[in-house]
């Protein structure tokens, strides 16, 4: 599958979707994107910058949601203009899609909306690539139905069906906790869509701090290594220059100054894993 200007798949190096959880300011966004660009160019990692203009799903009504659609999209447009990077952001309702798609290169659907058929259809009809997040409540094999919905809508609109990714972000495990089942990454390959692993939301503790979500960022490297060892097309990771001061999802964000070391390890592992065929293909 061609994504932006690079090929993605299990026969290609993993690509990275990374950035701050939410657009907090123009300067921080440009600085963060610039640093990530430097790291990824050094390691030859295809890179898409991500950030949200609005966080519609918040634990508390008092939580910071963002700078608003117009300002958030303007800043993401500056990332493209100043740094020449492709940009991804999430959309939360059908009426936002047209405006968002006019600015960004890739759309993302929130995990909680993966079963909303009209919403998935509308995203698919945008003509943009779409990273479709698996709901925390959904079995991995059920993602085939979600991807099929997107492909059906694209085909009916006369658009390419080869634009959709399936993203794993953990599954609910009791209250205020998520776990990652690495088998799901192999199962989701049956969608015939590139599989992406979200290593930072997978360590989130939803609503774990009462009015906000907690997280265990120390386990991001653990799960990221496990996912790369399993074999994925892409990785998703949120980062922040100072996670303790992040306005959203700080507890599960990777410190920006640790991204280089983490990615260096993951690149080495990815190269080793993809050097040989995946043995599980012969075990059925």
UniProtKB/Swiss-Prot annotation:
Keyword field contains Transferase: yes
Pfam family, one: DAHP_synth_1
Major place of residence: cytoplasm
Annotated metabolic or biological route of this protein: Carbohydrate biosynthesis; 3-deoxy-D-manno-octulosonate biosynthesis; 3-deoxy-D-manno-octulosonate from D-ribulose 5-phosphate: step 2/3; Bacterial outer membrane biogenesis; lipopolysaccharide biosynthesis
Reactions it catalyzes: D-arabinose 5-phosphate + phosphoenolpyruvate + H2O = 3-deoxy-alpha-D-manno-2-octulosonate-8-phosphate + phosphate
GO cellular component: cytoplasm
Compartments in which it is found: Cytoplasm
Main enzyme class: transferase
Superkingdom field: Bacteria
Keywords: Cytoplasm, Lipopolysaccharide biosynthesis, Transferase
GO biological process: keto-3-deoxy-D-manno-octulosonic acid biosynthetic process
Molecular function in Gene Ontology: 3-deoxy-8-phosphooctulonate synthase activity
Listed EC numbers: 2.5.1.55
HAMAP family, sorted: KDO8P_synth
Family: Belongs to the KdsA family.
Name listed for the protein in its UniProt record: 2-dehydro-3-deoxyphosphooctonate aldolase
Origin species: Burkholderia orbicola (strain MC0-3)
